[in-house]
Amino acid sequence: MVRFKSRYLLFEVLYPEAKEFFDYPTIPSDSSITTSSLSKIIRTMVAENFGDVGIGKVASSLTVKYFSPNTSTGILRVSRQHFRLAWAALVLIRELYGKPVIIRVVRVSGTIKKAELAAIERNKSEIHNISLMDEPIEV
């Protein structure tokens, strides 16, 4: 028996319309965005863009394992054979709950541990960048 092999996609949600927060790298997402609602939205995008064949390929394996509204990052699990289909569906999402968004896949990993470590490293670097922005500039 062959074990189920999957890929984990670390993605971030960007808000292009938020000009008041333009200096900061990430903007928190709405707290109403949950893992289950994201899964439904991604499945809908697969069905709209790739039809019954596309949804048949990814339906059993597509799950959002993690989503943080504070950092607007998430981890999506999908079968290794069809991860590019899920990636394309993520990129095609243009709106979440009425707000225009851009979803960018940051990393593709074979294990959830490596995807989590990549998310932690991204968060650490963003905290460092924000702390550098908040320091006063001496002239």
Swiss-Prot record:
GO cellular component: multimeric ribonuclease P complex; nucleolar ribonuclease P complex; nucleolus; ribonuclease MRP complex
Keyword Hydrolase: yes
Matching SUPFAM superfamilies: Rnp2-like (SSF160350)
UniProt GO MF annotations: ribonuclease P activity; ribonuclease P RNA binding
Keyword annotations of the record: Hydrolase, Nucleus, tRNA processing
Keyword 4Fe-4S recorded: no
EC supergroup of this enzyme: hydrolase
Family the UniProt entry places it in: Belongs to the eukaryotic/archaeal RNase P protein component 2 family.
Protein name per Swiss-Prot or TrEMBL: Ribonuclease P/MRP protein subunit POP5
Organism: Schizosaccharomyces pombe (strain 972 / ATCC 24843) (Fission yeast)
